[in-house]
């Protein structure tokens, strides 16, 4: 079968059971699938096996070592431990701050080629899934490795929707928080609280082997996927002083999320189907991204045997960090500061002179155009056709054009990433900036859960306990406090001044009689 025929055949199958209720305009917005999007039919990596041996000569001792190389081009770090200079040497360690070139797991969930700008879920190009799939189906794909049949998809959607209600106790916790509580803080707290309401699924309470049961695992998966948007919506409504809205069982995943945000309790309300489809595509794009910071945190926590709710809460906490999940908010602030396209040349010069920071460009993995950003950029016009055009989009397009034609940025491989345009779309859809990261976290639950599930089946899974390279004092002996002398004048080596409130000063100024 020719490549184009294979693509058409794949699309025909997808279209038969993935069609959304209304995709008006999207067929013109999303790009046509390119002929190279046929990776779903390729079962082996193009480079073949990389298996062999690595010969290492230790110039310190003159010894020669043979280290096995796997078919995937990896060496076991523990094999380097045998490289030693003598009895007091504990063996060679890998020093890799930030895990720039360390693979703590083997995974079949997500593939990224940052140099070529490729992202695939279970072998499917992200462009193809964004074009034809739905978030709930992509969640199934990530979790179980294959696209579901029509009946499997129906069962999956129904089961997830049946677990969308949140325990009243969790809603009470959300309602007890301040009106100005950050939605991500609310999401972390509520996700962690779910552990308390499901003690039957906690290995610390119900036995370490509980997750060996497929039924138990699957139940936690649908619980979290179902409840995440309900919790997020409750956090959103809390900031407006409004009570939570019960989910609807008659809407799609993304429609239901918008329904809980906007219905004001009107059970007959239905979100705009085109906006719901845009949100669904954004959810697909954010669902998974292999071993990013928060996913690594989820797997790290899960390796201890902790319950999956705590693992996901910890992952969301990592996503809360501004270096991970908060970049799209920084992009909006940057574009607003630039103001108009006429100010871009001065801004570009400021970036080159290290006087200004450019947000939304560059990525830890991608040294090419982020494939997600390409899809999001095309979605912007669809959103603007419904809610009106955001003037900052003109600044964004002009900034991208200026940067990609400037040797300074091209040489450093600084291309737009997923955050560059997503913030503009979210703002156009009426979401406040503090809610952007929540819109990242809700779909990323699918990624966290698929990695959690995979780690449970991996025979190489161990409790994560990294080594360190100790650089401190080798040994010293205890001295009584009166005999100690100040060993350093450095402020970083002593306790600093912690300011106290005026109310505390007033209280301390008083006295109490016995």
UniProtKB/Swiss-Prot annotation:
Q: What's in the keyword line of the UniProt record?
A: Peroxisome, Transferase, Transit peptide, Tricarboxylic acid cycle
UniProt pathway annotation: Carbohydrate metabolism; tricarboxylic acid cycle; isocitrate from oxaloacetate: step 1/2
> Which Pfam families is this protein grouped with?
Citrate_synt
Q: Which GO terms describe its biological process?
A: fatty acid beta-oxidation; tricarboxylic acid cycle
Q: Which GO terms describe its molecular function?
A: citrate (Si)-synthase activity
| EC annotation from Swiss-Prot or TrEMBL | 2.3.3.16
Something else the entry says is: Citrate synthase is found in nearly all cells capable of oxidative metabolism.
The protein in question is named Citrate synthase 2, peroxisomal
């Amino acid at each position: 079968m020719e490549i184009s025929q294979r693509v058409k055949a794949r699309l025909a199958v997808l279209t038969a059971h993935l069609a959304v209720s209304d995709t008006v305009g999207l067929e013109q917005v999303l790009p046509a699938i390119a002929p190279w999007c046929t990776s779903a039919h390729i079962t082996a990596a193009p480079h073949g096996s990389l298996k062999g041996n690595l010969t290492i000569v230790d110039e310190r001792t003159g010894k020669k070592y043979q280290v096995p190389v796997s078919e995937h081009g990896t060496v076991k770090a523990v094999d380097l431990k045998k490289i030693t200079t003598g009895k007091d040497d504990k063996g060679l360690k890998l020093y890799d701050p930030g895990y720039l070139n360390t693979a703590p797991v083997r995974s079949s969930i997500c593939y990224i080629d940052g140099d070529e700008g490729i992202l695939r879920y279970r072998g499917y190009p992200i462009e193809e899934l964004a074009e034809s799939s739905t978030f709930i189906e992509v969640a199934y794909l990530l979790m179980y490795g294959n696209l579901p049949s029509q009946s499997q998809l129906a069962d999956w959607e129904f089961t997830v929707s049946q677990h969308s209600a949140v325990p009243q106790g969790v809603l009470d916790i959300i309602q007890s928080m301040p009106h100005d509580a950050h939605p991500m803080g609310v999401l972390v707290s509520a996700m962690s609280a779910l552990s308390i309401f499901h003690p039957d699924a906690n290995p610390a309470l119900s036995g370490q082997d509980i997750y060996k049961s497929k039924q138990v695992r699957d139940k936690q998966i649908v619980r979290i996927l179902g409840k995440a948007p309900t919790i997020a919506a409750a956090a959103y409504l809390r900031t407006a002083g409004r009570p939570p809205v019960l989910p609807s069982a008659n809407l799609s995943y993304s429609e239901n999320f918008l329904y809980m945000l906007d219905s004001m309790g009107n059970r007959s309300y239905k979100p705009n189907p085109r906006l719901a489809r845009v949100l669904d595509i954004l959810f697909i794009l954010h669902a998974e991204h292999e071993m990013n910071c928060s996913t690594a945190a989820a797997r790290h926590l899960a390796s201890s045997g902790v319950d999956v709710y705590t693992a996901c809460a910890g992952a969301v906490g990592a996503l809360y960090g501004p270096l991970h999940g908060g970049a799209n908010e920084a992009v909006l602030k940057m574009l607003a500061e630039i103001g108009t396209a006429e100010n871009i040349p001065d801004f570009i010069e400021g970036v080159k002179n290290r006087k200004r920071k450019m947000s939304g460009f560059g990525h830890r993995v991608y040294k090419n155009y982020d494939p997600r950003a390409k899809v999001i950029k095309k979605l912007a016009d669809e959103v603007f056709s419904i809610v009106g055009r955001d003037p900052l989009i003109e600044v964004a397009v002009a900034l991208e054009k200026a940067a990609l034609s400037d040797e300074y940025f091209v040489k450093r491989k600084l291309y737009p990433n997923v955050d560059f345009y997503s913030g503009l779309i979210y703002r156009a859809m009426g979401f406040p900036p503090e809610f952007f990261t929540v819109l990242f976290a809700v779909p990323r639950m699918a990624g966290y859960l698929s990695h959690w599930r995979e780690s449970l089946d991996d025979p190489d899974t161990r409790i994560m306990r990294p080594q360190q390279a100790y650089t401190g004092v080798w040994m010293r002996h205890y001295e009584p406090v009166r005999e100690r002398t100040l060993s350093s004048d450095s402020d970083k080596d002593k306790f600093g001044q912690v300011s106290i409130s005026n109310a505390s000063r007033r209280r301390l100024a008083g006295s109490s009689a016995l």
